Each structure stands twice: as C-alpha cells, then as structure tokens.
Regions:
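Active-site entrance/lid segments in N-terminal catalytic domains of soluble metabolic enzymes
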Residues: 1-172, 185
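Conserved, mostly hydrophobic/aromatic
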Residues: 25, 190, 201
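Exposed boundary/loop context
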Residues: 172-173, 194
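Glycine-rich beta-strand-to-loop/alpha-helix junction loops that act as flexible
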Residues: 174-182
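C-terminal or late-domain output modules
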Residues: 184-194
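C-terminal, active-site-flanking charged/polar segments
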Residues: 196-202
Length: 202
C-alpha cells in the first residue's frame, strides 16, 4: 500500500483533475498497524473523501465506523443524510452481515466517549447500514477465500433482503459481484443472477 504522504498527493492530484466527477479511495484493514488505518481515515475526512472501498475486514473497526457516522444529519424534510459512503468487499457471510447491519452500539459508545461524534450522529446511525453497497467477492486473481460465485451471490442477496426487512432502511443496499469477471459472458451471468454491478480488478 501507499504511505500517507503518497495518498495525500494522489487525493490532491485527483481533486485538481477530476473537478466535479466523483471518485473514491480504498481502505484496506491493517491488522498489524491499526493506527495507520485510523490516520488514513482522518486523512480522507480532512480532504472530504466521501466514498471508500473497504476490503480485507473481518470485523468492524473504530476508524471504519467513525468514517461512516461522521457528519450524519437530517435535511429540512427530515430525511437522514449520510455524507460518507462505504462499499464493502467481502467473501464471507458473517462479515457481510456486519456491514449490512447498523454500526455496533459498543463502537458508537466509544466514539461518543472520545468526543469524535455527537449523540445526534449516534442516534441517526442506528437507522443506517454500515455499507452503502456491498461487493460479494468470489474466487479472484488475488487474495481470495475461494468462494464460488454461483452460491455466494444468491446468499448475499438473500441476506440483504432479510436485513433490509429487519431494519427498514430508507434505501435498499446494492449487491455487486467481483471475482472471475473477465469476459462479457461472465458479466452477463452476474447480472442475470441479480448483481446490481460487477467489479473487475486483476
């Protein structure tokens, strides 16, 4: 991965070149350097990066919840506005469930105690999932859990529907598919199974 200075340089370059075109950055969970993850989130918030792709997370972390919750408010019509969006990339159902659920109360409480978020942000966060959208990562060219797309995507879609009904979110979470999407035929197969989008990397 890039160091913080390199990330900041990339942010400034894209800000100048992209204008009003939206873009996002990656956030990879770093088990060995948790402070680097926190510093990266602070950097993103300072530069008003509103979209991140969260990958390699096995559990939700304080910096990740902080990014999602910071700045939540209601508009004049009473709608909940969440400026910071997370697209989670996961291959395990138990991890997907965490991202498709509201932020954990324990982590929200810690953020309030540290005065990193307000009580109002905490209250509104309970009505939103951690992830705006979620990519089901099947067997891919890089780091992988060797999950078969044919069973992984339908499982994630069913889980999304179950949690949407449980929590009554104001918008449905989009579920995409990544891993092995290398030809037009494989992309078409993903869409025919119900994927909202496809992700093609390596």
């Amino acid at each position: 991965g890039l160091c913080l200075n390199e990330i900041e340089t990339a942010i400034c370059t894209l800000d100048q070149r992209m204008g009003s075109i939206p873009f996002g950055f990656n956030l990879i969970h770093n088990l060995n350097e948790p402070e680097l993850e926190a510093q990266t989130v602070q950097l993103y918030l300072r530069h008003k990066i509103r979209l991140i792709s969260a990958s390699a997370f096995m559990d939700l972390t304080l910096p990740l919840v902080y990014f999602r919750v910071k700045g939540i408010h209601r508009d004049p019509e009473g709608n909940i506005i969440c400026p910071n969006k997370i697209i989670a990339k996961v291959s395990r159902v138990e991890v997907a469930k965490k991202f498709l659920s509201p932020p954990p109360e324990k982590l929200l409480g810690q953020l309030v105690e540290k005065k990193m978020i307000t009580q109002e942000e905490t209250n509104l966060a309970r009505y939103l999932p951690m992830a705006e959208d979620l990519t089901a990562e099947a067997d891919s060219g890089g780091h992988t859990d060797n999950r078969p797309a044919l069973s992984l995507l339908p499982t994630m879609l069913a889980l999304r529907d179950k949690l949407n009904e449980k929590y009554g979110y104001q918008r449905s979470i989009c579920i995409g598919l990544g891993g092995g999407i290398a030809t037009p035929e494989s992309a078409a197969a993903a869409f025919s199974m119900g994927a909202a989008y496809v992700l093609s990397g390596s």
